[in-house]
Structure formats: C-alpha cells, structure tokens
C-alpha cells in the first residue's frame, strides 16, 4: 500500500465525527506536506497564480540551505582550527557531542567531512529541538482553533536555528522557540496575523533573558574553554584596523570563515539564497534595496563625521554588510511579508528605516555591537503606521485630482 492510499484510508478517522477528530490538524499537515492539497476553486478565481502558500514557504526553506550547510561546515571548521592550534583543549573536551563526533569523524580542519560532522553535531540538535517544540505549539493551537497547520513553521524553525550560537543549551532553544511561536505569533491569531517576526521575537527573548549564552566571546566557537571574538566585536574594540590585524580580511567575512551565529557568517551563501527569493518575487527587492541604501547612507555619514573615541564611526558600509547578522536579516527577516510593510512606498520606508537603525545601534549604542535584530523588530512595530500614512497620502492625492 502506497503512502497516498494509506492516507486516504485513514482520513475518515480524522474528519468531523471520527475517532481522532481533534488531531485533524496533524493529519492535514502531513497530507499537504507530502502531496498537493485536493481542494480546488469552484467559482471564478479573482487571482490566479502558480505559487501558493505551501510552495512559497518551501521555497524560502530551501533558500536557507546554502547558509545552513555552509554554517554547519564553518562551525566545525572554527572548532577544529582551535583544536589544531591548541591540542590541550582537544584533550579536555567531553560530553555526548564530543563522543558522537569522535565516533564518526576526526578533528582535522582541512577535512571537509570532519568539519561538517562537527558542525552537524551542534546544528542538528538545535534544529530538531526547535522543530519538535515549535511544531508541538503549532499543532496544539491549530487543533484548538480547528485550523490547518501551514508550512510557515518550516521557515520559522530553520531561521531561528540559524541565528543562534552553536553552544546554546538545548533547553534554552526550547524555551526561546516556545516564546516566539506562542507570544510572537499564536496569541495574535497565528500565521498571517502576527506583527512581529516570530524567529526574531524568540531570539530577542533569549538575548535579554539569557545574555551569557547569547553574547560575549565564549559562545561563538563550539569548543569548551575557548573564547573568540566576532569580527563586529573586534571592530567595536579597535575599528577595522583591529579586525584586519587579527587576521580577518573582507573576503574572509564575505565568504564566512569567521566566528558568529551558525547561519549568519557567510554573506555569499546568504546572497545565493536571496537571489532566488528576489528572482521568484517572494522577497521584496524594494525592502532589500531600502535596507542597503539606509545602511550605506548613515555609515557613510558617520565615516565623514569621524570620532576619536568611537572606532566604529570609521567602519565602511561594505564591512557593515559582511559582519554580524546584517546580510541574513536583510534577506530572510526584513522581507517577511507578514511583519513588513505591505505598500510599495511603505516597503522603501520600511527598508531604509532598518538600514539606518542597524548602523545607529551598532555605532552609537555601546551596549549592542550588533543591531540587526533590534532594528528589524523596531521596524516591525512601525510597519502598520508606515502603511497607514502611505495609504492616507494616496487617498488625499487621489481626492485632490478630482476636486
């Protein structure tokens, strides 16, 4: 018996009046994930398009793969590089991850396999916990509301896992995604009704609730007892000269062979996925362009002003682009169609606001050397107001033409 025949055979148990009626959302989620939904439009459609919500979300999910696979390799590479330089640290490692890695691979930074297995041992448990715990909340709320479970959580789960440091405790991952899904999305009605990005909401919760595991120099490398600063932290301490003197070139930062959150280090891998999203019109090119313009404008202004006490005033825009979470946030977070502005003019304003805010937070606020998360969440809060003024201005303009 094939999968399709099996699903058809048990379907009546999950329909209204069936033995497992309350679990219909779970059955429907599995059915629509594996196969195209059987529902069709019976009357004339107002809009005809070749892409639906399922295809859109799966496309976004697939577009994260370049950043995800590179992130796993880089997580392992950074750890194995430290082991090669400090054998005493390798001898001091212990725990289930270390035992698992030792059973399937070695610790050679020049080995693609060793690096990938090392990184996978950290990323895959984070992703699994995110998917299981977040999926539980999605199914629970869908069952209570008698709604379907849509594919939006595929995107939320992978985005959240990719913006975390590899060393984060798994119980904090579960707590963070629970907050993001329940408080950031479900209490507002679920997919399509949230005004904050759920993945960023989850990360913000962890950032403020457990700062020791989300920031600092000890969380970015999967090696117990080692502390390594990110390029942005080095820039904050001594400017671009400090970054370069530490051995990090602009190309290193662009390719992604640096410390950082699992999926945020490689601007190149992120742009590969972003090109597909923009080309398929899933991501708004207006928002992406607006973010770049806002960032370039303010960073250039700070370069011209200069500062003797703040070295980040001198950071050029092309360095802002490749360090921290700027590229990942611009491509995958700012373009979220639910929490971003919906009007064309509003998308420009929304994007520019993010670009300006991220540089402002990075350069002027000494408490947060990284500002992309807060910049996007702030813009999410402003998005309804931006659209309101754009729509009102359009109404006034059209009325004026008819006077």
UniProtKB/Swiss-Prot annotation:
Keywords associated with the record: Cell inner membrane, Cell membrane, Flavoprotein, FMN, Ion transport, Membrane, NAD, Phosphoprotein, Sodium, Sodium transport, Translocase, Transmembrane, Transmembrane helix, Transport, Ubiquinone
InterPro entries documented for this protein: NqrB, NqrB/RnfD
Family stated for the protein in its record: Belongs to the NqrB/RnfD family.
Membrane spanning stretches: 56-76, 121-141, 163-183, 220-240, 258-278, 287-307, 312-332, 348-368, 371-391
GO molecular function: FMN binding; oxidoreductase activity, acting on NAD(P)H, quinone or similar compound as acceptor
Gene Ontology annotations of biological process type: respiratory electron transport chain; sodium ion transport; transmembrane transport
Key word Zinc present: no
Protein source organism: Stutzerimonas stutzeri (strain A1501)
Major localization listed first in the record, in broad terms: membrane
Subunit structure, as described in the record: Composed of six subunits; NqrA, NqrB, NqrC, NqrD, NqrE and NqrF.
Residues modified to FMN phosphoryl threonine: 230
Top-rank taxon: Bacteria
EC number: 7.2.1.1
Gene: nqrB
Protein name: Na(+)-translocating NADH-quinone reductase subunit B
Subcellular localization: Cell inner membrane
Cofactor(s), names only, from the UniProt record: FMN
